[in-house]
Amino acid sequence: MLSCGVDFDIFEISLKDKPKKMIEISPKGTVPVFVYKNLVLDESIDIMNWATEQKNNNFIKINPHDWALIKSMIKINDGEFKNKLDQYKYTSNKEASLKTKYRKECEIYIKNIDERLEKQEYLLSNKFGYLDMAIFPFIRQFFNVDLKWFEEASYINLKNWVERISGSDLFIK
């Protein structure tokens, strides 16, 4: 929204105690929910697509040649990786061997992202873009499951990428 100059409000939502108004707006009951005039979007990717389509979007420009790769990486991220990430996140720490198994399954994806970042600062180039925006929240969820492990892991490129994005003006705002 910042990239296209749309004013917005962010509300912290407890998923255990969802506000009635949120459910009225989006019966699906998941976050995020974006409301603009008569438009309601309740999928992150739909919100991102809407933002990139705005005339005054001065931030995220997508090279048409990158679309196939973007779609492929997002499909893997939102499918296979997200499923493994949920297993990793929601497995009790008491089940250490199972938690480690799920983390290692996530690492197959994480390693690919880290290797991709050997060549440039961001996923498609040296400039933050659409793909970074789409994938970053999931990578952040992954490392927040066990921050100590992530800090000690050998994914230097990924750690630098996370730090660059986390410290950027866009993220801080």
Protein language model regions, located:
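Membrane-interfacial terminal anchoring regions of lipid-handling membrane enzymes
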Residues: 2, 123-126, 173
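Secondary-structure junction/capping motif
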Residues: 42-43, 129-130, 173
